[in-house]
């Protein structure tokens, strides 16, 4: 099984636990796992040309594509892109989706759309697998979709997260001014932030944890560090103080590191 990178630890771990050999960016694998609407942590989207290339490659080489369409609902800066499943005509692609981001996180209702070749293999075994989602929740969700509420809910949340991401970007820029680099994609609920930092990522994370802040580090060098900031679960009013706290933590860590170097 090939993943685009090593960031999706939960997914690669599941396959590894079931005896699959996990690799990264290897097109010669039998299974290719991709998230076209979430190619990077900051919301880059796989273009149609690349999707068609992947679909044609999988068809020609007999490989199976697993399309995890995570956050495909939150595309702000371009028109929605056709899914790999749709472009492939339902062949050689398994489509995975979830409603947890659109509805309550506690409603863990996900779904999988199989190509016809796999449906025939799955049908005789379907009764051997227990459904973990509540029947009541499934029925309520079905009615919710049937009545058209999911469409309006998606539009509402798309506007909400687009505005929140813009507000977060403005808060970061206000606090760090020109001393930072911000990346946002066409979709998603996160941005990447690169700031000057001479202390190692582990020390920065520990300092942040002591202040009640959890950091996700994408990359670090001897002179700077790149973080992922999410706007999904934090109120807009907390963006500015959170950014200021992050800057204080970073400045204090770097100052302490510089002082230690001088003393040594």
Predicted regions and their residues:
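Conserved PLP-anchoring active-site segment centered on the Schiff-base-forming lysine
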Residues: 1-10
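Active-site phosphate-binding strand-loop segment of PLP-dependent enzymes
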Residues: 9, 15-76
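Helix C-cap/helix->beta junction micro-motif
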Residues: 60-61, 91, 211, 253
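Active-site PLP attachment segment
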Residues: 85-121
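Conserved PLP-binding active-site segment of the aspartate aminotransferase-like
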Residues: 114, 192-197, 214-249
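Active-site C-terminal subdomain of aminotransferase-like
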Residues: 118-137
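Structural signature of PLP-dependent enzymes
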Residues: 123-129, 147-169
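Conserved glycine-rich beta-strand-loop-beta hairpin in the small C-terminal domain of fold type I
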Residues: 159-169, 180-194, 224
